[in-house]
Amino acid sequence: MNDSEFHRLADSLWMTIEERLDDWDGDSDIDCEINGGVLTISFENGSKIIINRQEPLHQVWLATKQGGYHFDLKGDEWVCDRSGETFWDLLEQAASQQAGETVKFR
């Protein structure tokens, strides 16, 4: 994967997250902000999830209250380089825990 392909795929992730949160109709307040390639999801309780891209490594990094995760593209899924869990699974788990209700991005 070259740098432009990496950015295209990361942009697609960001867009999906932003669209899902724009359509969010849950009880808790969840905001999303993109600044300089970093996507920040802010929750009503003051907690945050930070997602950023690591261009030199062609990885997407996810920081949650539970910890930090690094994802490599394998086929058409971003997969954690330690646990093997997918980006979407870990993001949904963290967002649901931090929101206090089920949050889905897929």
UniProtKB/Swiss-Prot annotation:
SUPFAM superfamilies: Frataxin/Nqo15-like
Top-level taxon: Bacteria
Gene Ontology CC: one annotated term: cytosol
One GO BP: iron-sulfur cluster assembly
UniProt KW keywords: Iron, Metal-binding
Gene Ontology molecular function, alphabetical: ferric iron binding; ferrous iron binding
SMART domains per the UniProt record, alphabetical: Frataxin_Cyay
PANTHER family in the record: FRATAXIN, FRATAXIN, MITOCHONDRIAL
Family, per entry: Belongs to the frataxin family.
Function: Involved in iron-sulfur (Fe-S) cluster assembly. May act as a regulator of Fe-S biogenesis.
Protein name, UniProt field: Iron-sulfur cluster assembly protein CyaY
Organism annotation: Klebsiella pneumoniae (strain 342)
